[in-house]
Structure formats: C-alpha cells, structure tokens
C-alpha cells in the first residue's frame, strides 16, 4: 500500500506544488528553492546534503518550507503533505515520502524528512531521477487551517469585457487580456494575428465548453462533470490553458464515474501525469491489472512499464501475505 494512501480522500482539497531544480548534482550543503505563493504562505523546498560525507554514506534530506505572506505575528498554516521524486513523464520510478502533518509558523517554518534517501540513488547516471541535470519533486499539500491571513477575493469588475467570442451563433462577452494572459495560443490570435480586432468566431468547440473555459478563468462558479470534461480537456490542450487542464484533472481524480482504463488513456492523451500516478496507485487487484494489460494493446510504452512495475509490487505483497511461516519478513536481512 502506498504511503500516500491516507491522502486519497483529500483529493478535492489538495494542491500539488512542483519544483524543478537545475544542476542538482552540484548540491553541497543547504539549498532552498524559489517560493510559490499559495493560501497565505510562500512555499519552497529545502535540500540538505554535504559533499564531505563519504559517497557511500551521503544522504539527502528534504524539507517543505513555508514563509508567511503577512506581517501578522499570529500567522500559521496547518497542513498535511507528502512528496515524491519524479523523472521523465509517465515513468513509474518514484520515491514517496511518509505523510507529514505540521503547523507552520514564522518561527517553525520547515518540516520534512532528514536523511530521506541515499545521495547516489538520485544522482547516479541512469538512475532515472535527473533528466538533463534537472531534478523534479512534487508535494501533495492539503491545508486544513490558515490563521492570521485573509485571502483577498478578486474583484471581477476588473475583468472589463472588451471583446466577444462568437460560438454556435451565440455571443460570450470576455476580457481579451484575461484570455491572452492564460493562453499563448489565444495571445497570438488576439494580439499578433488580429491586432485591434475585438470579435472572434470559434468553430472547433461547443458554446458550453467555451463558456466553461471563460467561467474557469474568471473564477465564476462552474463544475466540471462527466458530460463536459472531455471537451474541456481538448480545449485546454488546444489553447494551452493550464487552469482548464487542472480543473479537469481534479475532477477525474475525484470521480468514480470514469473507468480506470479511460483515466489511463486520458493521462496519455493529455499528459496528465498526476492522474496516471494516482490511478495506477489505486489498482489493488492483480486480476484487474492483468485485464487492463490484456484488453488495452494500444497502451503507450510508458504507461505499460508503469503497470508492469505495479504488477511487481502486487506480486511481492501477495508473496508476503501467503507465506506460511507467519513471520514478518520486512526489514529482515539474510545471514
């Protein structure tokens, strides 16, 4: 069972923070990444590892760091989180941390795993965790309470409608700058290909899907569901709109109305790595896993490899559970 198991039911409240570290193999001492603002805190990752240690004994420590986004001395953020190391998209080589719970304050602003793994496990050539010298770590972060900080609500009147989208003979009033800021494709269409134009006709998508996209960007109330998620994924991919892709992925993580096979295909088509990781993690039946492999011959190589590794894990669990000696084998070494 994955160490992230306790976080499964918190998918609706979870935020994933991704950090990419350049030239990671040259780390010596302590390094703190650039921060990301989220829910009243500036979040960063801190690594600690010393070159003075013997190569066979050198370890890597990993900490989540949160600095206050306010001067309020009562500021604090209560969280649950776990992290994982990733290599290239879709590959199942990961290292997963235990679940941590912590309340970050101005004086106690870091929490993590000391000596989490061997240094060589990460930087050895072909280990899978350095991709062109870049090391990637993701934190699944669930915030249960924030004190001493009030998140400001955006004033939607600042999104002045200065343009129109015409879809299926219906008109949607939009802020062109808002569209352009969230989509490089729409930026080119609005400012480079058609400078000065304020009305744009969209032919490839339905009125409902375009309205959904605009609602997501304007932070209006909108729900992704089984009827619209596919159109929104295609729209988000075509226009390269991260916010739309994220909303669809969050829906797919929560819903039980979409099959495992469909989620795996979607993770390939739309490069939804987190969806693939969580979907494979939740497969706990060997027969189901074998059926997926047998019935989906068109599955991509990276997903196929990840499913094979999951099969190895399930077989290993079955062997331990079926052992007749009734002794615990985990952690034992042969003499």
UniProtKB/Swiss-Prot annotation:
This is BTB and MATH domain-containing protein 39. PROSITE patterns: MATH. The lineage of its organism: Eukaryota, Metazoa, Ecdysozoa, Nematoda, Chromadorea. It holds the Pfam family BTB. InterPro entries: BTB/POZ_dom (IPR000210), MATH/TRAF_dom (IPR002083), SKP1/BTB/POZ_sf (IPR011333), TRAF-like (IPR008974). It comes from the Eukaryota. Residues 161-226 form the BTB domain. Gene3D superfamilies: Apoptosis, Tumor Necrosis Factor Receptor Associated Protein 2, Chain A, Potassium Channel Kv1.1, Chain A. Residues 14-141 form the MATH domain.
């Amino acid at each position: 069972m994955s160490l992230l198991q306790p976080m499964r039911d918190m998918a609706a409240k979870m935020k994933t923070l991704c950090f990419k570290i350049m030239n990671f193999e040259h780390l010596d001492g302590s390094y703190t990444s650039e921060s990301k603002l989220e829910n009243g805190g500036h979040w960063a990752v801190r690594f600690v590892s010393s070159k003075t240690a013997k190569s066979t004994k050198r370890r890597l420590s990993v900490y989540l760091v949160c600095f206050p986004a306010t001067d309020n001395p009562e500021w604090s953020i209560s969280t649950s989180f776990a992290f994982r190391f990733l290599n290239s998209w879709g590959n199942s080589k990961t290292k997963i941390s235990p679940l941590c719970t912590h309340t970050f304050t101005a004086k106690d602003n870091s929490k993590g795993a000391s000596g989490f793994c061997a240094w060589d496990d990460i930087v050895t050539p072909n280990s899978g965790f350095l991709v062109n010298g870049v090391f990637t770590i993701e934190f699944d972060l669930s915030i249960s309470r924030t004190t001493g900080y009030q998140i400001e609500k955006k004033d939607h009147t600042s999104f002045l409608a200065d343009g129109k989208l015409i879809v299926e003979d219906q008109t949607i009033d939009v802020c062109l700058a808002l569209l352009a800021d969230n989509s490089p494709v729409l930026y080119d269409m609005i400012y480079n290909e058609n400078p000065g134009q304020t009305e744009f006709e969209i032919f490839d998508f339905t009125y409902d899907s375009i309205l959904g996209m605009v609602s997501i960007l304007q932070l209006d109330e909108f729900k992704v569901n089984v009827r619209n998620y596919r159109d929104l994924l295609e729209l988000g991919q075509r226009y390269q709109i991260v916010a739309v892709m994220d909303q669809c992925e969050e829906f797919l993580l929560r819903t039980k109305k979409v099959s495992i096979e469909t989620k795996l295909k979607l993770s390939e088509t739309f490069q939804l790595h987190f969806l693939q990781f969580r979907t494979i993690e939740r497969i706990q039946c060997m027969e189901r896993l074998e059926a997926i492999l047998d019935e989906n011959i068109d599955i991509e190589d990276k997903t196929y490899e990840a499913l094979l590794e999951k099969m190895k894990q399930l077989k290993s669990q079955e062997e331990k559970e079926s052992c007749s000696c009734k002794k615990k084998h985990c952690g034992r070494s042969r003499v």
